[in-house]
Amino acid sequence: AMGSEMALARLGVATCMIFSPFFARLGGQVSVSRSVAFGVVLMCIALIMTIVYFFMDQKLDSQTGEAEEKDDPFKISDLGKILTDAGFWIVALLCVLYYSAIFPFQKYAVNMLQCNLTLTAPDANSFWAQPDVTIVQYVIMLIVAAAGFASNFQKKANLKYGLLGLSIVALVTYCYMGYMRQSAESIFAVFPLLAVLITPILGSYLDHHGKAASMLVLGSVLLIACHLTFAFVLPMFKGNAVGGIIIAYTTILVLGASFSLVPASLWPSVPKLVDAKVIGSAYALIFWIQNIGLWLFPLLIGKVLDATNPNVTDPTQFDYTAPLVMLASLGVAALILGFVLKVVDKKKGIGLELPNITE
């Protein structure tokens, strides 16, 4: 269930990635305010849905009688049980390290691609230069998401693999359109799509086979490999219009796989670390710690980028090697914590490697 929820969340990320540049350029004059307005509209819709959910939850509590159950109420002192748990702190720190290597990177990724890829704008009169192509790409993106998402819930093998095949074909088509548009933002927008496709699959695997801690380790390894590829391999292909984009797409898709592995295994592990009545508090503390990293590391990336490019005035000529190595080092720290978590899990019998569903 959590894997499916996160897959839909990744679709939201992809929507913002593909439509933000579209709205910014709408009308022929670039204006960030239109993209911001688009985000505000989405937030208003989310607020309405949250209010509806609140009342639905209240109604459910009144029907089941859970609202009146106070046998074991929450106490502030219960937070001490969370803060003194070694497993919780390992997961919280792993979370802040991993997400700090992902979300701040998204802020700079498009410019990084512009600096390392040889992109030639299509002719102004060609199909690929028209704003309507964005709509076509988004429809294909929805096909990737819908077919891949639906394939996870099919019991018939033919239908399951047919939908999966359709999703993969649509994904390849989307990548081809990004190449033809010669647009860095269109190329990077593929990042969340593989996560939409495989996160429910990983969630199902976690439910039936376990291995959450191992998935955290694997996700960290992929993260390190991707950032180092962006830092050292991609610049080697600058001037190679096809080779550079192939390397970029491959690395972005692998990073998307990492972005599926870690969240799909990290968030369902929290209930195994803390008491049921403090799960909400545990998640809140983790998000609080995570947001510290999401505030700090974009600033650090900017400082490092400025320090390593002192005389560069053209934004398409920045050298991103140092910031990418810094992000890879966060992945190394997350990897170490992943191995520590496996040791703690084995020592304390937390059950992170065990399946959620036992028959």
Please place each PLM-identified region on the residue numbering.
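Glycine-rich segments within core transmembrane alpha-helices of 12-TM secondary carriers
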Residues: A1-A24, F287-P298
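Interfacial helix-cap and linker-helix signal at transmembrane-aqueous boundaries
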Residues: F19-G28, L113-Q114, Y205-D207, I301-P310
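Symmetry-related core transmembrane helices of the 12-TM Major Facilitator Superfamily/SLC fold
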Residues: R34-Y53, T321-V340
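Flexible cytoplasmic inter-helical loops of multi-pass small-molecule transporters
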Residues: F38, F54-D78, K348-T358
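Extracytoplasmic gate region of multi-pass secondary transporters
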Residues: A86-G148, A170-A195, P263, F297-P298
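Helix-to-loop junctions at the C-terminal end of transmembrane segments
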Residues: G148-K155, I198-K211, L305
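C-terminal transmembrane helical hairpin of 12-TM major facilitator-type secondary transporters
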Residues: L163-G178, S183, A189-L194, A212-L266
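A late C-terminal transmembrane helix in Major Facilitator Superfamily
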Residues: A276-P310
